[in-house]
Amino acid sequence: MKNNSIRGCAYISDKIFEIIRNYTIKYNDIYITVAGTIGDVGIVPIEYNGANLTENADKLLLNNQICKDWFVLYLQSEYCQMQIRDVTTKVGQPKLAIKRIEELFIMLPPYNEQKAIYKKINCLFDYIRT
Protein backbone atom coordinates (compact mmCIF):
# COMPACT_ATOMS: atom_id res chain seq x y z
CA MET A 1 0.00 0.00 0.00
CA LYS A 2 2.02 2.88 -1.31
CA ASN A 3 1.55 5.77 -3.71
CA ASN A 4 -2.21 5.30 -3.88
CA SER A 5 -1.85 1.65 -4.95
CA ILE A 6 -1.72 -1.85 -3.50
CA ARG A 7 1.02 -4.34 -4.44
CA GLY A 8 2.71 -7.44 -3.05
CA CYS A 9 -0.30 -9.24 -1.63
CA ALA A 10 0.04 -12.43 0.41
CA TYR A 11 -2.61 -15.10 0.80
CA ILE A 12 -4.01 -16.63 4.00
CA SER A 13 -5.57 -19.98 4.85
CA ASP A 14 -9.32 -20.45 5.30
CA LYS A 15 -8.70 -21.00 9.03
CA ILE A 16 -6.99 -17.61 9.40
CA PHE A 17 -9.68 -15.98 7.27
CA GLU A 18 -12.37 -17.14 9.70
CA ILE A 19 -10.50 -15.43 12.54
CA ILE A 20 -10.00 -12.11 10.73
CA ARG A 21 -13.06 -12.07 8.45
CA ASN A 22 -14.22 -8.72 9.88
CA TYR A 23 -11.01 -7.07 8.69
CA THR A 24 -11.60 -6.92 4.97
CA ILE A 25 -11.53 -4.10 2.47
CA LYS A 26 -13.88 -3.46 -0.41
CA TYR A 27 -13.55 -1.74 -3.72
CA ASN A 28 -13.54 2.04 -3.17
CA ASP A 29 -12.74 1.86 0.56
CA ILE A 30 -10.13 4.31 1.81
CA TYR A 31 -7.04 2.87 3.51
CA ILE A 32 -4.20 4.41 5.49
CA THR A 33 -0.97 2.67 6.43
CA VAL A 34 -0.30 2.75 10.17
CA ALA A 35 2.97 0.82 10.50
CA GLY A 36 6.09 0.60 8.37
CA THR A 37 5.60 3.39 5.85
CA ILE A 38 3.10 5.42 7.85
CA GLY A 39 0.49 7.72 6.36
CA ASP A 40 0.21 6.38 2.82
CA VAL A 41 -3.41 6.77 1.75
CA GLY A 42 -5.40 5.47 -1.17
CA ILE A 43 -8.62 3.98 -2.49
CA VAL A 44 -8.91 0.21 -2.87
CA PRO A 45 -8.99 -0.82 -6.55
CA ILE A 46 -11.57 -3.34 -7.84
CA GLU A 47 -9.08 -6.21 -8.03
CA TYR A 48 -8.67 -6.13 -4.22
CA ASN A 49 -12.38 -6.16 -3.42
CA GLY A 50 -12.82 -8.48 -0.41
CA ALA A 51 -9.10 -8.65 0.42
CA ASN A 52 -7.97 -9.01 4.02
CA LEU A 53 -6.48 -6.06 5.84
CA THR A 54 -3.34 -6.53 7.93
CA GLU A 55 -2.43 -4.77 11.15
CA ASN A 56 -0.26 -2.42 9.05
CA ALA A 57 -3.24 -0.55 7.60
CA ASP A 58 -6.65 0.74 8.64
CA LYS A 59 -9.85 1.19 6.65
CA LEU A 60 -11.44 4.64 6.97
CA LEU A 61 -15.23 4.88 6.86
CA LEU A 62 -16.80 8.23 5.99
CA ASN A 63 -20.22 9.71 6.52
CA ASN A 64 -22.18 11.19 3.63
CA GLN A 65 -20.92 14.72 4.34
CA ILE A 66 -17.42 13.90 3.13
CA CYS A 67 -16.39 13.51 -0.51
CA LYS A 68 -14.12 10.45 -0.65
CA ASP A 69 -11.83 11.78 -3.39
CA TRP A 70 -11.37 15.12 -1.61
CA PHE A 71 -10.68 13.35 1.69
CA VAL A 72 -7.91 11.22 0.16
CA LEU A 73 -6.27 14.36 -1.26
CA TYR A 74 -6.61 16.05 2.13
CA LEU A 75 -4.98 13.10 3.92
CA GLN A 76 -2.16 13.17 1.36
CA SER A 77 -1.61 16.91 1.83
CA GLU A 78 1.53 18.14 3.56
CA TYR A 79 -0.63 19.72 6.26
CA CYS A 80 -2.26 16.43 7.20
CA GLN A 81 0.92 14.37 6.71
CA MET A 82 2.68 16.70 9.16
CA GLN A 83 -0.05 15.99 11.72
CA ILE A 84 0.36 12.26 11.10
CA ARG A 85 4.12 12.47 11.64
CA ASP A 86 3.58 14.44 14.85
CA VAL A 87 1.18 11.88 16.39
CA THR A 88 3.02 8.73 15.29
CA THR A 89 4.53 6.87 18.24
CA LYS A 90 8.28 6.71 17.97
CA VAL A 91 9.14 4.14 20.65
CA GLY A 92 9.97 0.69 19.28
CA GLN A 93 8.30 0.25 15.90
CA PRO A 94 6.65 3.52 14.83
CA LYS A 95 2.86 3.17 14.72
CA LEU A 96 -0.14 5.38 14.02
CA ALA A 97 -2.93 4.45 16.45
CA ILE A 98 -6.58 4.58 15.38
CA LYS A 99 -7.26 6.99 18.24
CA ARG A 100 -4.65 9.38 16.80
CA ILE A 101 -6.27 9.19 13.36
CA GLU A 102 -9.62 10.09 14.92
CA GLU A 103 -8.00 13.13 16.54
CA LEU A 104 -6.51 14.59 13.33
CA PHE A 105 -7.71 18.13 12.65
CA ILE A 106 -9.75 18.07 9.46
CA MET A 107 -10.70 21.39 7.88
CA LEU A 108 -14.03 20.29 6.43
CA PRO A 109 -15.59 22.59 3.83
CA PRO A 110 -19.19 22.02 2.66
CA TYR A 111 -19.66 18.91 0.49
CA ASN A 112 -20.12 20.80 -2.80
CA GLU A 113 -16.95 22.76 -2.09
CA GLN A 114 -15.06 19.52 -1.41
CA LYS A 115 -16.17 18.21 -4.81
CA ALA A 116 -15.12 21.45 -6.52
CA ILE A 117 -11.71 21.40 -4.80
CA TYR A 118 -11.14 17.79 -5.84
CA LYS A 119 -12.19 18.51 -9.43
CA LYS A 120 -9.82 21.50 -9.68
CA ILE A 121 -6.86 19.65 -8.14
CA ASN A 122 -7.48 16.62 -10.32
CA CYS A 123 -7.49 18.85 -13.43
CA LEU A 124 -4.19 20.36 -12.30
CA PHE A 125 -2.70 16.88 -11.81
CA ASP A 126 -3.87 15.92 -15.32
CA TYR A 127 -2.25 19.08 -16.68
CA ILE A 128 1.03 18.31 -14.88
CA ARG A 129 1.09 14.73 -16.25
CA THR A 130 0.81 15.92 -19.88
How does the language model describe each region?
Residues 83, 87, 103-130:
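Amphipathic alpha-helical coiled-coil/heptad-repeat segments
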Residues 71, 75, 114-117:
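Interdomain signal-transducing alpha-helices
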Residues 60, 64-65, 120-124:
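Conserved aromatic/hydrophobic "specificity hotspots" at molecular recognition or selectivity sites
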Residues 36, 46, 62:
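Short, conserved catalytic or interaction motifs in soluble domains
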Residues 37, 50-58, 66-69, 89-111:
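A short glycine-rich beta-alpha junction/loop motif
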Residues 1-3, 23-40, 53-57, 72-85:
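Short Ser/Thr-interspersed hydrophobic loop/turn segments at strand-loop and sheet-helix junctions
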Residues 1-27, 47:
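Sequence-specific dsDNA recognition surfaces
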Residues 44-46, 87-90:
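Short amphipathic beta-strand starts and helix->beta connectors
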